[in-house]
Amino acid sequence: MSIKAEEISSIIKQQIENYHSELKVSDVGTVTYIGDGIARAHGLDNAMAGELLEFSNGVMGMAQNLETNDVGIIILGPYTEIREGDEVRRTGKIMEVPVGEALIGRVVNSLGQPVDGLGPIETTGTRPIEAVAPGVMQRQSVNEPLQTGIKAIDALVPIGRGQRELIIGDRQTGKTSVAIDTILNQADQDMICIYVAIGQKESTVRNAVETLRHHGALDYTIVVTAAASQPAPLLYLAPYAGVAMAEEFMYNGKHVLVVYDDLSKQAAAYRELSLLLRRPPGREAYPGDVFYLHSRLLERAAKLNDSLGGGSITALPFVETQAGDISAYIPTNVISITDGQIFLQSDLFFSGVRPAINAGLSVSRVGGSAQIKAMKTVAGTLRLDLAAYRELESFSQFGSDLDAATRAKLERGKRTVEVLKQDLHKPLKVEKQVLILYALVHKYLDDVPVHDVLRFESEMNTWFDHNHPELLEEIRTTKKLPDEAKLEAALKEFKNTFVPSEEK
């Protein structure tokens, strides 16, 4: 076999032409300090704020402080295996979480990783956790109601789709119950719900998930959890992960409800990180940008205009108060960012008024324009009546010689308070809310004993379901009150069948 020099030279030339030298250039730094969930690294001069960084053991971190000599990093995972002198390299990416329909029904952590033991989440879509909120011209006015199923909220402080309504109160006043009941009521409302649990006990989150599963609400709910036992960076990031998942649905024309339970714990986690990163403390030791921490999160809730699909994110942020002090730093910040607040009071809660909503301090700045016409008609004077009753109640403690008109107002007020009470995890459809409020306003309850009011409501709902479902259907579909003569006749007919407990 003869070797041809031309062939060999052509093969060598071909291989030289096809050779490409690919140099991978990456910025690599060295860990100079590690502890308490944060690290400092030297040599990452080109790192960007919020950029993901990778440690030599595969754990990720996020650049927070860009200083002259080093970079302050919050660590997104276990930090016990990281040592001083370890390598840390730039990734050129910012943090993203998985998004899409595959997340519905799952429980995930702040990084979007499943923690429910049901296997991996099959989705390829991701979104950055930090995004610019929709601008003024991309939005439209709130004009659709979000029915919570809670009479005291839908009647007194209505919430619209795209609104941000703060729920504020001391611990153990039923804040989480309000959120869970609102999620349960979205079953047939074409709404996707995201429940973000920040700094909760793992047993509490488990109970919430089981409640949602028991009522079939996990079919349209995503749970994002950063438990109290997890590092502060994960508590800080959890709300942003939740709203990023929500934005995917909103920009596809869907309606989303996001519950942040609660932002006080997120602010405390951010304070911890900021102090560890040696940022100067301000009021109550919070850093100077703690207002921006919450404003950039809550501004991402919006009702988009029709050209963008008309989707919405409704935000229900929670803030925990200490001994009812709503003038503390974080409560006043979030009150000024949101479109209203629902104040839950421990005195009312322990006196048996549940949900313990203080109608005087609670307000909805935009939801009234989204209330259905029937509800607006029957609930118009309810807030004033309740305020007058509270005033008379405190006044009546000093004297017993009250005139007939005052006594009548007090009796009506007692029945109003009783009507607004509601059992746990039993949200009420809006047509049935309208029915009982109509009966209250039109004096059908004036001669019903106070302790029988809730039984009257329950029996009336059952009676209307069987005898006049068309009236309920009319309220549901037209969103207006049916013919008053028919409604009055039906209510009188039911009233004649109702037997007070004394006469049984």
Curated annotation (Swiss-Prot):
GO terms for cellular component: plasma membrane; proton-transporting ATP synthase complex. Its EC number is 7.1.2.2. InterPro entries: ATP_synth_asu-like_sf, ATP_synth_asu_C, ATP_synth_asu_C_sf, ATP_synth_F1_a_nt-bd_dom, ATP_synth_F1_asu, ATPase_a/bsu_AS, ATPase_F1/V1/A1_a/bsu_N, ATPase_F1/V1/A1_a/bsu_N_sf. It catalyses: ATP + H2O + 4 H(+)(in) = ADP + phosphate + 5 H(+)(out). GO terms for biological process: proton motive force-driven ATP synthesis. It is a peripheral membrane protein. It comes from the Bacteria. One of its GO terms (molecular function) is ATP binding. Signal peptide: none annotated. CDD domains: ATP-synt_F1_alpha_C (cd18113), ATP-synt_F1_alpha_N (cd18116), F1-ATPase_alpha_CD (cd01132). It is found in: Cell membrane. The keyword Signal does not apply. Produces ATP from ADP in the presence of a proton gradient across the membrane. The alpha chain is a regulatory subunit. F-type ATPases have 2 components, CF(1) - the catalytic core - and CF(0) - the membrane proton channel. CF(1) has five subunits: alpha(3), beta(3), gamma(1), delta(1), epsilon(1). CF(0) has three main subunits: a(1), b(2) and c(9-12). The alpha and beta chains form an alternating ring which encloses part of the gamma chain. CF(1) is attached to CF(0) by a central stalk formed by the gamma and epsilon chains, while a peripheral stalk is formed by the delta and b chains. PANTHER family: ATP SYNTHASE SUBUNIT ALPHA, MITOCHONDRIAL. Belongs to the ATPase alpha/beta chains family. This is ATP synthase subunit alpha 2. It comes from Listeria monocytogenes serovar 1/2a (strain ATCC BAA-679 / EGD-e). The gene is atpA2.
